[in-house]
Every structure is written in structure tokens, then in C-alpha cells.
Regions:
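Flexible, solvent-exposed coil segments and beta strand-coil junctions
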Residues: 1, 31-34, 40-45, 114-120, ...
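Sequence/structural signature of outer-membrane beta-barrel proteins
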Residues: 1, 16, 33-40, 44, ...
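Long alpha-helical, hydrophobic tracts
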Residues: 1-41, 45-52
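Short loop/turn motifs that connect adjacent beta-strands in outer-membrane beta-barrel proteins
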Residues: 14-28, 65-78, 141-147, 178-184, ...
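Extended hydrophobic secondary-structure segments that form protein cores and membrane-embedded regions
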Residues: 25-34, 77-82, 154, 187-192
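Outer-membrane beta-barrel translocator domains and adjoining extracellular loop/strand segments
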Residues: 38-48, 90-94, 161-165, 199-204
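A conserved mid-domain beta-alpha-beta active-site/ligand-binding segment of alpha/beta enzyme cores
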Residues: 52, 56-60, 64-139
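Outer-membrane beta-barrel pore domains
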Residues: 122-287
């Protein structure tokens, strides 16, 4: 997808945390933005579709890295979290209309809290807006002859995913970098699974203080019942390209129709001579 117009405050590179003797580094960002893709959606959506336009966005991330910046210890570890949220805007569904968009509502979105009395029933029952996120884990071993990295990105759309009820869903990968071998410099293997989704259907727990119902299951990644365009900008997916963007639907459907996948990705690169290098990419999709 194209970048969402936003104001972003960030620590873009890992920066050493004081008093940690160089062992702990941090980076992150905080952003507020707005969609300007109404015309694109209007031109694409079929006449039965309803959607929210002029959507407001919030994004934040935080990553911590434990690494010997003096390069005396070969192992490094990284953990992080990414959070995106859609809120505000106006729905073409007259029963929904203008969505809450005050500063107080922004604070609710930032904190992942439920909506106020002017929010829809669903947003009062769950959280205000549509939320998407990942947990990131990475472990790297570095040697004079190269490096070996294992990493995992865990997906979540709601609380059930945040507490890992969606099992092993996410991206699992490994990367091998080889020094001193020109014809094969790097190999990457990745596996993406989104088939669990906290179960095959949405379930309800009858223990909410204000309304009878809160639950999970049937996470339906990148889709949302009210923000029908889902995790997209200008009809293109913001997250994994393996979850096919609504722009490729042939019937004006603005949702992700194929979001239960189990795919493999392989890549390799190197140089065959001083003037000839190569990169091979192969993806096996099973959705």
C-alpha cells in the first residue's frame, strides 16, 4: 500500500539506553494519520458495499534489543510490538454515520479501550475502532564467517490473538548470511500461517460489566465489521502481501476474502562474478 499521510515522532534506529553499559537498545515510533482514499474506494466498491471514509489512523511501535555493542558477545535478542488502529471517519451506512473522533476518543484508541456512549454497540462492547498488531521476536548469532537469525512475527486482531489463543499464527523465518562465499551470500526461509485465528467461529463470554458479551475466535485477519475496507489504504493491504489485497477482487468486494493461508517463501542471493549478481525468490501459496 501507499504510505498513509501522518505525523510521526520516532526513534528510527536502535539507540543505547543509558546506564546499561551499551547492552540495551530501544527504538519506536508514535503516529497519527488520516486516509485520503475515498475516491479509490468509491470507484471500486459494488453498490451493496458500505464503508467508512476519511478514516483516522493511529500507529505506535516499541522494540527492545539486547546486544553487546562492543561485539564481544555473539548472541543478540530483540522483542517488539506494533499496533495500528482505525477510528473516526464517516460510514456510508446511515445506521452508523459519523464515528467518534474527539481527543478523548483518541486516548481510548491509543489505550485500546472501549468506546463511549456515542460509539456503536460493538465498539462499546469491545474496543473503539479497528485494531491490528504484531509481536516481534528475533534471535541472532553472529560469527566472523557470517550470521544466523531466527525470527517470529505473531499476528493479532483482538484480545484473543494478544493472549496467543490463535496458536502459531504469524510469520516464522530464518536467515543465514555467509561471509567470504561470493556465489551464495544469503539464504532466507519463511513460513506464514494464518489458519488458526483463535478458532473457526466467534464465541462470546457473558461477563462484560455493561453489555452481555465479549469474546474472540474467528479473528478474520485484516477485516473488520464496521471499517469494512480493513487493514488497507487505497484498497491495498498494509500488512503481509500474502493476504491478497481487496483490489484483486473481481466483484467490488472491499474485504479480504482469502485470509486463512499456509505459505512458504524462499530466497537466496549471491554474485557469480564481479559484474554479475543474482537474487532468487520463490513463494508457494496455499490459501
Amino acid at each position: 500500500a501507499s504510505p498513509i499521510p501522518e505525523v510521526n515522532i520516532s526513534i528510527p534506529q536502535f539507540t543505547v539506553v543509558p546506564l546499561t553499559k551499551g547492552w540495551l537498545q530501544v527504538k519506536g515510533d508514535f503516529a497519527i494519520g488520516r486516509s485520503f482514499d475515498r475516491h479509490t474506494i468509491e470507484q471500486f466498491a459494488n453498490e451493496k458495499e458500505t464503508y467508512v471514509y476519511d478514516i483516522l489512523w493511529h500507529h505506535k511501535s516499541l522494540a527492545l534489543q539486547v546486544k553487546d555493542t562492543r561485539h564481544g558477545f555473539p548472541l543478540s535478542a530483540r522483542i517488539g510490538v506494533n499496533h495500528w488502529a482505525q477510528w473516526g471517519g464517516t460510514s456510508t451506512n446511515p445506521k452508523i454515520g459519523v464515528q467518534p473522533h474527539s481527543f478523548k476518543d483518541l486516548l481510548r484508541v491509543i489505550g485500546g479501550r472501549s468506546g463511549g456512549d456515542n460509539a456503536t454497540f460493538a465498539d462499546q462492547d469491545n474496543v473503539l475502532g479497528a485494531h491490528y498488531g504484531t509481536y516481534d521476536f528475533k534471535l541472532t548469532y553472529t560469527h566472523d564467517k557470517g550470521s544466523l537469525t531466527a525470527y517470529h512475527q505473531h499476528y493479532f486482531n483482538d484480545l484473543s490473538g494478544m493472549v496467543f489463543e490463535n496458536g502459531t499464527d504469524g510469520l516464522w523465518g530464518g536467515e543465514l548470511t555467509i561471509n567470504g562465499l561470493s556465489w551464495l551470500k544469503k539464504v532466507v526461509v519463511e513460513y506464514v500461517n494464518t489458519r488458526d485465528q483463535s478458532g473457526p467461529f466467534h464465541f462470546i463470554w457473558f461477563d462484560h460489566e455493561k453489555h452481555p458479551g465479549v469474546g474472540g475466535g474467528g479473528d478474520d485477519y485484516y477485516n473488520n465489521g464496521e471499517y469494512r475496507t480493513g487493514f488497507t489504504y487505497a484498497n491495498q493491504a498494509i500488512g503481509s502481501p500474502l493476504l491478497i489485497s481487496p483490489a484483486h477482487n473481481d466483484n467490488g468486494d472491499i474485504t479480504f476474502r482469502h485470509n486463512r493461508i499456509r505459505d512458504w517463501h524462499f530466497a537466496a542471493e549471491g554474485a557469480l562474478s564481479t559484474h554479475l549478481s543474482y537474487r532468487l525468490l520463490f513463494t508457494k501459496m496455499n490459501s
